[in-house]
Amino acid sequence: KYETFDDPAKVMAYIRAEGKYPVVIKADGLALGKGVLICQNEQEAADGVKEIMLDKKFGASGNHVVVEEFLTGPEVSVLSFCDGKTVKPMVSSMDHKRALDHDEGLNTGGMGTVAPNPYYTPAVADRCMKEIFLPTVAAMQAEDCPFKGCLYFGLMLTPDGPKVIEYNCRFGDPETQVVLPLLESDLLTVMQATTNGTLDKTEVKFSDGAAACVILASGGYPLAYEKGKEITGLTEGQLDAADVTVYHAGTAIKEGKLVTN
């Protein structure tokens, strides 16, 4: 259940009328994965609405907000290749969003991921394909707006079954870092098939292995974080495991040193 608003007063009137907490408030636009607030009471909701809609923390993305009922259950990220008529899901993953250990702290763009998602069983995958993935692609076709590219399904496995939390028309970060290393098919071939509309004739195969991603973030993240701090321990000779890959974002080389940026 959800409602959208462009008036802060109407947001709070709706939340008070519903009277259910926690309640979820989302900036209806791009916010670097940080535009979702889970509010435990009316004061937190009021503070969140002010932050998003009045203080414009996320700029124009906060002109509208979505207020959603709070759902419980394991979260699942399923990236998929879609050529407008055929959808082929990639291996599932689980994103850990909280900044601190033990699922504590602020929501972030993601502090780590694992793939495959242990809660996403073959039975759940079949249900999602029938009830969510295929109907989504068919609906876009019916609106004469077929989608080609990476279609990202953000799901929650609730006691009432899988629910869609969000769609993204892009690869996920940090989900991609654990999903694509498990892809055994040639990525370029799959992407060409996605573009050409021939996914139904193209094999998309993933290994039976697993992958994990851990985010190393500068102090203060996801709020004001420290910049210019030296990062050590990431050179090839300093990494113990041969199968470790380091991906960079928000870093720079200054005076020959790797620093946060």
Task: Name the predicted role of every residue range.
Residues 22-25, 63-66, 200-202, 256:
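A short linear hydrophobic-aromatic micro-motif
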Residues 26, 109, 214:
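Residue-level signal for inorganic ion chemistry
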Residues 255-261:
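Short, intrinsically disordered, charge-balanced linker/junction segments flanking boundaries
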Residues 80, 157, 216-217, 248:
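Hydrophobic side chains in beta-strands
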